[in-house]
Curated annotation (Swiss-Prot):
Belongs to the LCL3 family. This is Probable endonuclease LCL3. It comes from Ajellomyces dermatitidis (strain ER-3 / ATCC MYA-2586) (Blastomyces dermatitidis). Residues 129-290 form the TNase-like domain. GO terms for cellular component: membrane; mitochondrion. PANTHER family: EBNA2 BINDING PROTEIN P100, SERINE_THREONINE-PROTEIN KINASE 31. The gene is LCL3. Residues 45-54 have a biased composition (Low complexity). It is found in: Mitochondrion; Membrane. The active site is at 180, 188, 228. The keyword Membrane applies.
Length: 303
């Protein structure tokens, strides 16, 4: 812009400076094709041009090609299912898993399934299987109640938090097996309006001291008319814990119970078979006196 003649000297100097600046300032977007760096006018340090950022450039949209729709019916029809099942990589793991599950179920049903009451015992147990558990109460001189603990301590009973034997009567209701000792007929306590038989208190006290809160093993034979299971019971006691004792035989030796002389419905299991007395008036060899008589006790079923 031409300056008027009345412009001052300072304005003329500013105008000349602007013209010099316009000559030295490069035009935006102008690049040197021969070199990527330019020399500064007042120094020898080359000025490097930064690379062009193309990340913000908008690329044209690409046309996506979708795969054709899958025909499931055709794929199922063409797949060789029989060959896949017969493949050892599929067949062997399947057989191992199935066999393991069936084996665990069988072991649980045969050895680890808890029996709540006597009426739940399968007939396959009679004369073949035994029941292991802890005695929770003694009702009479020849019967008691047992809480079944299948597997014992190896299965976690009495040391795992969820495998405890209940102690309260409410918790034990309908959860114990009523067992009657086989081969003996101890005197009964008063019940159902009947008076107590002689030595019933002594027999009850002895059996309570001998069995209460102890782990026993019962070999079951049958169920009687009162819903109890008749069994030969063994217990281990100190100072000889490795020797198991027949509870019914120990009562006979203590003179606290006679041999059961009923003509029918009597089971003599274990060691009691060889010590059975013949019916009164019959012929037979009596067992040793020390087995059946004691101080103030019974001998040969006489009271």
């Amino acid at each position: 812009m031409p300056w008027l003649f009345w412009s001052s000297g300072s304005q003329r100097q500013m105008s000349s400076n602007e013209n010099n600046t316009d000559k030295t300032t490069p035009i935006v977007g102008e690049t040197n094709s021969s070199s990527s760096s330019t020399q500064c006018a007042n120094c020898s340090t080359p000025i490097t041009t930064p690379p062009t950022d193309t990340s913000n450039q908008v690329n044209p949209p690409h046309q996506t090609h979708r795969p054709p729709a899958l025909d499931w019916n055709a794929s199922l029809a063409t797949r060789d299912w029989a060959g896949d099942f017969k493949d050892p990589r599929n067949l062997i793991p399947t057989l191992l898993l199935t066999s393991g599950i069936l084996f665990c179920v069988r072991i649980h049903r045969k050895y680890l399934r808890r029996i709540p009451v006597a009426t739940s015992i399968s007939p396959t147990y009679f004369h073949k299987r035994s029941i292991f558990g802890r005695v929770t109460s003694v009702g009479d001189g020849d019967n008691f109640r047992l809480f079944h603990t299948p597997g014992g301590r190896l299965a976690g009973w009495e040391w795992l938090p969820f495998r405890k034997v209940p102690t309260a009567k409410k918790e034990l209701k309908d959860r114990t097996i009523h067992i009657r000792l086989a081969g003996v007929d101890a005197p009964e306590l008063p019940h159902f309006g009947r008076p107590a038989q002689p030595y019933s208190d002594a027999a009850h006290t002895w059996l309570t001291t001998y069995l209460l809160n102890r782990r026993v093993r019962a070999y079951v034979y049958r169920q009687d008319q009162y819903g109890r299971v008749v069994a030969t019971v063994y217990v281990r006691r100190w100072p000889f814990p490795f020797i198991r004792r027949d509870v019914g035989l120990q009562m006979l030796r203590a003179g606290l119970a006679p041999v059961n002389e009923a003509k029918t419905g009597v089971d003599f299991g274990g060691e009691g078979t060889g010590r059975r007395l013949p019916p009164r008036g019959g012929k037979g060899e009596e067992p040793p006196e020390g087995d059946l008589e004691g101080e103030g006790g019974f001998r040969g079923g006489e009271s």
